[in-house]
């Protein structure tokens, strides 16, 4: 099943969204060409105890979302995977997560109040077959004894 109950999700604060021209590193991540480097960028953060805990930079190629009008309220509630499942025709078939990934030139990290070398990042790629539907780079300040992934059975 694609859609999960999002009531337990940490609410996101939507900071920015709109079309941008992807830099070379982002084009490479998404498999975009120099002739069509445009993506829809969504920047959200999660606050814990009035401090920014993580910042999510999500990018959806315009070839995937060209006729879609993004629902800002839903972007605050749903994980991007669930949003794409609900609103897009192409449904994700799998994800891949890479840790300690390079950051792109459009990322503003001052919200995290930490030097870049202290930050931890990971990329979550959403695929439909071999097609990249979206990528989210999450940047966070590591904290001791904090669970990174919880798997439920």
Regions found by a protein language model. Name each.
Residues 8:
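Amphipathic alpha-helical segments that line or abut small-molecule/effector binding pockets
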Residues 11-153:
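C-terminal all-alpha effector/ligand-binding and dimerization domain
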Residues 1-5:
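Conserved small/polar residues in nucleotide/adenosyl-binding loops
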């Amino acid at each position: 099943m694609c859609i999960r109950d999002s009531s337990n999700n940490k609410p996101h604060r939507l900071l920015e969204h709109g079309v941008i021209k992807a830099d070379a590193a982002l084009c490479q991540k998404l498999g975009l060409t120099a002739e069509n480097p445009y993506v829809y960028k969504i920047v959200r953060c999660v606050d814990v105890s009035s401090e920014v805990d993580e910042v999510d930079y999500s990018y959806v190629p315009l070839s995937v979302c060209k006729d879609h009008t993004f629902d800002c309220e839903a972007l605050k509630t749903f994980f991007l995977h669930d949003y794409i499942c609900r609103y897009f025709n192409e449904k994700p078939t799998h994800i891949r997560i890479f840790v300690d990934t390079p950051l792109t030139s459009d990322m503003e990290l001052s919200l995290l109040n930490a030097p870049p070398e202290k930050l931890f990042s990971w990329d979550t790629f959403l695929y439909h077959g071999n097609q990249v539907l979206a990528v989210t780079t999450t940047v966070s300040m590591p904290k001791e004894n904090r669970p990174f992934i919880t798997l439920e059975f």
